[in-house]
């Protein structure tokens, strides 16, 4: 389909994992393979979806929330615009069954299902500063956020850095932290311990929220958009910034420092890397040898089976694939989380051993 990629049919995958054990709770493809164009057309005719605001549409979760209808005498839409929209959706219907789902809708459902699955009194959420993620998290965990039982940390990474620059920043961060420890009189050379002391000292004066006064003269605290540089740079990302969008004023600096030390995106990045490595059908389109066109030889033409493949990989990743962590232990994510005390293999999963 020449020019079809210009329709921006990106299919998103929403992944959530536990930061310490790297256990992946869910991995959901933002796609509805059960919906058909006939159903969309029927809903549009029945509920007049093409004349409603987006928030009132039954199928607003889909990238095509209504099916184009021929304009009546009282419609403001002209026939040329109708034919243009009809041509686009007709071309889309010939491509693959089903329709893409908006990422915010999938993310909201994703978090809701995790909330039902995980029995927890307090929640600590780490993400980049993406509006759809923030909106979904705040909708699902409204009560917990209001009671300060949930906090949202932001991890921002500059992905334009070169590998060389990241390695340079990693060495720089290590040297700066050791120098700071010597100046403060700490005998330990353990970087994580020094980073904890550094953050505790910094947070005695640094605030992620600030006081403001409303029009009625009432004082309240608001997000200050005041991130800090994480003292522990990494080899693949270099320096990165951390922030918190929820109010932490009720906590002591050492408690906040302990949480900030764990703010990173390693757990989700690790699983996404496995998806790219083991499920070739989810790779991005490749540039052809001539460099002027795209080759979709590995493109994903069936999101339904992509979801199946990701779920199988997630099970293998959680229960069968061990990794070595800083504590020198080689365990699977499920073992680290305490779900099981053994490492499984494919036969255990296939035959339910």
Q: What is each of the regions a protein language model found here?
A:
Residues 1-120:
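RNase H-like nuclease fold core
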Residues 1-2, 22, 125-128, 269, ...:
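Short, conserved catalytic/metal-binding motifs centered on acidic residues
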Residues 4-5, 38, 133-141:
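A short acidic (Asp/Glu
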Residues 64-119, 211-264, 293, 297-298:
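Intrinsically disordered, low-complexity acidic Ser/Thr-rich regulatory segments
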Residues 111-137:
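Acidic/histidine-rich, metal-coordinating catalytic segments
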Residues 145-168, 172:
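Inter-helix linker motif
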Residues 215-219, 223-227, 234, 242-243, ...:
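C-terminal domain-tail junction helix/linker
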Residues 263-294:
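Short amphipathic alpha-helical "interface-anchor" segments enriched in bulky aromatics
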């Amino acid at each position: 389909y020449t020019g079809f990629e210009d329709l921006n049919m990106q299919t998103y995958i929403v992944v959530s994992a536990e930061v310490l054990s790297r256990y992946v709770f869910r991995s959901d493809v933002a796609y509805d393979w059960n919906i058909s164009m006939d159903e969309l057309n029927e809903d549009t005719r029945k509920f007049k979806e093409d004349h409603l605001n987006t928030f009132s549409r039954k199928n607003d979760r889909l990238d095509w929330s209504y099916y184009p209808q021929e304009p009546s005498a009282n419609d403001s839409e002209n026939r040329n615009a109708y034919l243009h929209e009809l041509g686009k959706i007709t071309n889309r219907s010939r491509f693959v069954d089903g329709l893409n789902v908006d990422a915010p809708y999938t993310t909201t459902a994703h978090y809701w299902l995790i909330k039902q699955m995980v029995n927890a009194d307090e929640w600590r959420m780490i993400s980049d500063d993406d509006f759809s993620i923030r909106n979904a998290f705040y909708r699902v965990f409204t009560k917990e956020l209001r009671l300060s039982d949930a906090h949202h940390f932001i991890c921002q990474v500059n992905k334009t850095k070169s590998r060389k620059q990241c390695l340079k920043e990693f060495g720089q961060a290590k040297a700066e932290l050791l120098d700071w420890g010597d100046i403060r009189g700490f005998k330990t050379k353990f970087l994580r311990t020094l980073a904890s002391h550094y953050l505790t000292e910094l947070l005695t004066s640094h605030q992620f929220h600030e006081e403001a006064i409303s029009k009625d003269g009432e004082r309240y605290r608001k997000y200050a958009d005041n991130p800090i540089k994480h003292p522990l740079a990494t080899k693949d990302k270099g320096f990165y910034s951390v922030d918190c969008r929820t109010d932490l004023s009720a906590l002591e600096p050492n408690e906040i420092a302990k949480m900030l030390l764990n703010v990173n995106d390693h757990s989700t990045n690790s699983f996404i890397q496995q998806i790219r490595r083991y499920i070739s059908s989810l790779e991005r389109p490749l540039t052809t040898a001539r460099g002027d066109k795209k080759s979709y030889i590995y493109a994903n033409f069936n999101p339904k089976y992509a979801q199946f493949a990701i779920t199988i990989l997630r099970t293998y990743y959680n229960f069968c694939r061990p990794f070595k962590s800083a504590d020198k232990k080689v365990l699977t994510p499920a073992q680290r989380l305490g779900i099981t005390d053994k490492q499984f293999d494919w036969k255990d999963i296939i035959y339910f051993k």
